[in-house]
Each structure stands twice: as structure tokens, then as C-alpha cells.
């Protein structure tokens, strides 16, 4: 039986460095942070969104409202992942109408998760603008015309490979690894 090959791409320090860079890019692009809110896509996008908001606050001194969104029932493949999908809660404790929403996810792959998140987001209001921030962009794998505004790093992979983001909040460690069958 063959073992999967696990190739480390980023460690915890690397993830922190990337989040600092992304926070600075957001601050530079948005001189007025007042209309800005950050919403993470369950599960790891939620933790990254909180970390990103905390990093912006550390750099700029301005707290950014954060929320999280569950896209399970908005996915176009949920029947393929099981007839009893596990639905998590959505917590958006502020209006998003006329706000600039930065949607945060761990990995941008086909674009389908982002599409589902955009669909879910419209149930909560009509933002002035939505921008996408991802820790990892698996470039060249898109099935939909979706592109991130803020990218931590680009990782070139084969379709059969898996990019896994591990975060201390859910996995006990911070790392990005590529698993090759």
C-alpha cells in the first residue's frame, strides 16, 4: 500500500508573515476602513478572517467587524458530499448593506466555494463591494471565472493533489501542506 507524500509549503511563522502582508495590502487599498467588514468561510476561513482582522487592528489600531458564513446548503455539489450535510452556524452580527466585504477562505481551487459564499452572502444584504482574500491560490485549477483580490501564496498543483491548510484552532498546528497520492 502506497503512502501519500506530504510536502510542507508553509509553517506557522510563514502563515503569520503572509497574514501580515495581506493585512498591509488591505490597509493600503482601503484608506478608509470604516465601511470594511471581514467574513470568513467555514471552517478554516473563519479562523483566518479573525486572525486577519486582529492583524489589521495591531497594525492600524482599528477594529474591523468580523463574521462567519456557512455555505453548505449553497454548494452545487452537496448531494455528492452526502445526503446529510453538516450545517454550521452563520454569525454576521452587523449589516453588510453598502459595506465592503472581504470574504476570507483558506484555499481557492475551482471557485465553487467562493460562488456558494457569494450566494449565501446575498441572503444577508447587498454589499457595496465584495473582495476575496485567500491564504493559498491553486492557480490554473479554476472552473469558474473567480479570482482573489488578496493572495497569500500561489501553489501550482496537479488536480489529484490536495492542498491542506492546518490551523491551530482546528488542527493543533499551523501549516500548509500538499498531499500527493
UniProtKB/Swiss-Prot annotation:
Segments carrying motif PRPP-binding: 101-113
GO biological process terms on file: regulation of DNA-templated transcription
Pfam families in the cross-refs: Pribosyltran (PF00156)
InterPro entries, alphabetized: PRibTrfase_dom (IPR000836), PRTase-like (IPR029057), PyrR (IPR023050), PyrR_bifunctional (IPR050137)
Function comment: Regulates the transcription of the pyrimidine nucleotide (pyr) operon in response to exogenous pyrimidines.
GO terms of molecular function: uracil phosphoribosyltransferase activity
UniProt catalytic activity: UMP + diphosphate = 5-phospho-alpha-D-ribose 1-diphosphate + uracil
Family: Belongs to the purine/pyrimidine phosphoribosyltransferase family. PyrR subfamily.
Annotated transmembrane regions: none
Protein name: Bifunctional protein PyrR
Organism listed in the record: Desulfosudis oleivorans (strain DSM 6200 / JCM 39069 / Hxd3) (Desulfococcus oleovorans)
Xref: SUPFAM superfamilies: PRTase-like
Amino acid at each position: 500500500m502506497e503512502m501519500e507524500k506530504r510536502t510542507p509549503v508553509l509553517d506557522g511563522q510563514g502563515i503569520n508573515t503572509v497574514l501580515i502582508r495581506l493585512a498591509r495590502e488591505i490597509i493600503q487599498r482601503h484608506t478608509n476602513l470604516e465601511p470594511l467588514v471581514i467574513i470568513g468561510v467555514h471552517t478554516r476561513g473563519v479562523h483566518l478572517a479573525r486572525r486577519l482582522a486582529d492583524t489589521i487592528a495591531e497594525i492600524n489600531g482599528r477594529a474591523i467587524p468580523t463574521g462567519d458564513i456557512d455555505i453548505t446548503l449553497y454548494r452545487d455539489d452537496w448531494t455528492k458530499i452526502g445526503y446529510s450535510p453538516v450545517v454550521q452556524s452563520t454569525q454576521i452580527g452587523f449589516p453588510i448593506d453598502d459595506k465592503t466585504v472581504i470574504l476570507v477562505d483558506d484555499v481557492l481551487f475551482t471557485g465553487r466555494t467562493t460562488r456558494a459564499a457569494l450566494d449565501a452572502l446575498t441572503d444577508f444584504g447587498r454589499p457595496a463591494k465584495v473582495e476575496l482574500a485567500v491564504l493559498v491560490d491553486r492557480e490554473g485549477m479554476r472552473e469558474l471565472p473567480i479570482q482573489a483580490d488578496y493572495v497569500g501564496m500561489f501553489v501550482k498543483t496537479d488536480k489529484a493533489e490536495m492542498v491542506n491548510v492546518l490551523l491551530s484552532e482546528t488542527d493543533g498546528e499551523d501549516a500548509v501542506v500538499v498531499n500527493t497520492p
